[in-house]
C-alpha cells in the first residue's frame, strides 16, 4: 500500500502554494504556512527514526472573517495530500457530562472517513477481477447449468426403458464433451454480448446481501461507538455475514451491484483498517471551525454567564489532550493523535485568540491573519480559479446547449456590487458572490430552454448587471439578500 504522503513528496512548499493558487485567490501567508506544514510531514517521515516520533506538527490557527477562504484552504490542502480530512465546528461540542457530542467524536469520524478512503483505493486495485467475477455471476443467471443453451430434452427421445443399458461408455463420454463444448460456446456468445452492452436493458433477478446500516443507526445514540464496539462487524458475525435478498434489476445495474459485492469479498478488511489507522495517525487533518465561539467563555464567566463560561472552557480542556496527543478508542481500533494536523479558525469578532486557555494557545503555535476581500479580489475569484463561479454557470447552461459569455466589464460590475453590499450590510466575503450571481441569472436560468432555446447565445455585460442588480446596489434594506 502506498504511503499516505507519497502524492506530495515531490511537491515543494512553493509548488504546493501554486496548486492552491489554482482555487484560492490571495491569502498568501496562510497558503505559505499550510504548505510548510504539509511538507514537514514528508520531512518527518524521512527524518532519522529516533527523531521521528519527537517531531510534532505545527498546528495552525487562522484568524479572519467569514468567506475569506479559511475552510477552502484546508479542504484543498487535504485533497492535494490525499489525506483524511474532517471539518468540525467547535461550538457543536459539549463538555464531558453535558448532553451533546464529545470532542473524541471528531477522531472517530475522521477514522471512518479514512477507512472509506482506503477501502475505495483497495477496491480500485481489484476492480478488473471483480468485474470478471460479476460477469460470471450474471452469465450463471442468464444461462443456468440446467438451461445452458443445449436442451437436454434431446436426451428424452432415448429415455425409454433399458436404453441406458445399450449406451457404451465411449458414447457417454462423447456426449458429455459435446454438451460441455456447446455450453462453453453458448456462454462465450453471451459473454461477448454482455461486454458489448447488448444485454444491458434485459431484466434479471439477482441475490444481494442486505445492508445492515439501518440496524447500526438504531443503536448509534446508545454510545456503543464510544465504547469502541464495531456494530457492523458484530451483527455481521451473528447473522452469518448479512441476509440475502432477491432484487429484480437490469443487467447494467446488476453488473455494478455485483462488481461492488465481489470487490468487497476480494479486499482484506483487516489490511484496510490497518492502513486507514496508519493514514489517520500520520496524515490526518482536522479543521476546527468557530474556535472563537468557545474562546469567549473565558470572559462570559466573569460577566455573569458562569454556566456557559464553564461549559465553553470545558470544551477547550477536553480538546487539549487530543491536540496534545492522546489515544482515542474507535470501532476500528486505537488512534494516536500525536501527529494529526489541527487547523483551527475563527472570526474572533467578540473575542481574541488570547481568550483561549493558555495550554490550548500553546498547541497552536502558528497564527495567520487572513485579509478581507476587496473588489479586485472578487474579480479574480469570479474569473481565475479552475472552479470559478462564472465557469460553473457556463458549464450548467452548456448542458442546455446555451452559450453564456461574461464580458470583462460585466464581471467588474458584479465584483463592484458584491463589494458594495458587503460594505453596506454585513461582510460575508466571497459568499456574497453566490447571492449576487444567482440573482443576476435567476430569470435566465428559469427561461431556458422554453424562452431561450438550445443553440442560443447570451452575453452578460455591465448594463445588464446594473439593470438587474440596481435594486440591490441602491437599497439600504438588503436583508433579503443576506445569506
Model-identified regions with their sequence ranges:
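Non-catalytic accessory segments flanking P-loop/AAA+ NTPase cores
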Residues: 1-483
Amino acid at each position: 500500500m502506498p504511503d499516505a504522503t507519497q502524492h506530495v513528496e515531490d511537491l515543494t512548499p512553493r509548488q504546493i502554494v501554486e496548486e492552491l493558487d489554482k482555487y484560492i485567490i490571495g491569502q498568501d501567508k496562510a497558503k505559505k504556512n499550510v504548505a510548510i506544514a504539509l511538507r514537514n510531514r514528508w520531512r518527518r517521515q524521512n527524518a532519522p527514526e529516533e527523531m521521528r516520533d519527537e517531531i510534532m506538527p505545527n498546528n495552525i490557527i487562522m484568524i479572519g472573517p467569514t468567506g475569506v477562504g479559511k475552510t477552502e484552504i484546508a479542504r484543498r490542502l487535504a485533497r492535494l495530500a490525499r489525506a483524511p480530512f474532517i471539518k468540525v465546528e467547535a461550538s457543536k461540542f459539549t463538555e464531558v457530562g453535558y448532553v451533546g457530542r464529545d470532542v473524541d467524536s471528531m477522531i472517530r469520524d475522521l477514522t471512518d472517513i479514512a477507512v472509506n478512503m482506503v477501502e475505495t483505493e483497495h477496491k480500485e486495485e481489484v476492480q478488473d477481477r471483480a468485474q470478471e467475477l460479476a460477469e460470471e455471476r450474471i452469465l450463471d443467471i442468464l444461462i443456468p447449468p440446467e438451461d445452458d443453451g443445449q436442451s437436454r430434452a434431446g436426451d428424452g427421445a432415448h429415455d425409454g426403458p433399458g436404453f441406458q443399458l445399450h449406451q457404451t461408455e465411449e458414447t457417454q463420454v462423447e456426449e458429455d464433451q459435446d454438451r460441455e463444448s456447446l455450453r462453453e460456446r453458448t456462454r462465450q456468445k453471451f459473454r461477448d454480448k454482455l461486454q458489448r452492452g447488448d444485454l444491458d436493458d434485459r431484466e434479471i433477478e439477482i441475490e444481494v446481501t442486505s445492508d445492515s446500516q439501518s440496524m447500526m443507526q438504531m443503536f448509534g445514540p446508545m454510545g456503543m461507538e464510544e465504547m469502541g464496539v464495531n456494530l457492523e462487524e458484530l451483527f455481521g458475525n451473528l447473522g452469518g455475514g448479512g441476509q440475502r435478498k432477491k432484487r429484480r434489476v437490469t443487467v447494467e445495474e446488476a453488473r455494478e451491484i455485483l462488481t461492488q459485492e465481489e470487490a468487497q469479498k476480494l479486499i482484506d478488511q483487516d489490511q484496510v483498517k490497518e492502513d486507514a489507522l496508519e493514514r489517520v495517525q500520520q496524515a490526518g487533518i482536522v479543521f476546527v471551525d468557530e474556535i472563537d465561539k468557545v474562546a469567549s467563555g473565558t470572559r462570559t464567566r466573569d460577566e455573569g454567564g458562569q454556566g456557559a463560561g464553564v461549559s465553553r472552557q470545558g470544551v477547550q480542556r477536553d480538546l487539549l489532550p487530543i491536540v496534545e496527543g492522546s489515544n482515542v478508542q474507535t470501532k476500528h481500533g486505537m488512534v494516536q493523535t500525536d501527529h494529526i494536523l489541527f487547523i483551527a479558525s475563527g472570526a474572533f469578532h467578540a473575542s481574541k485568540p488570547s481568550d483561549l486557555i493558555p495550554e490550548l494557545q500553546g498547541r497552536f503555535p502558528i497564527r495567520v491573519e487572513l485579509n478581507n476581500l476587496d473588489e479586485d479580489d472578487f474579480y479574480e475569484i469570479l474569473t481565475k480559479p479552475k472552479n470559478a463561479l462564472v465557469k460553473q454557470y457556463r458549464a450548467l447552461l452548456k448542458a442546455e446547449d446555451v452559450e453564456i459569455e461574461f464580458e470583462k466589464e460585466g464581471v467588474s460590475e458584479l465584483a463592484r456590487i458584491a463589494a458594495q453590499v458587503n460594505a453596506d450590510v454585513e461582510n460575508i466575503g466571497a459568499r456574497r458572490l453566490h447571492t449576487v450571481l444567482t440573482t443576476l441569472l435567476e430569470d435566465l436560468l428559469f427561461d431556458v430552454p422554453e424562452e431561450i432555446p438550445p443553440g442560443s447565445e447570451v452575453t452578460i455585460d455591465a448594463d445588464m448587471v446594473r439593470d438587474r442588480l440596481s435594486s440591490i446596489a441602491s437599497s439600504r434594506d438588503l436583508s433579503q439578500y443576506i445569506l
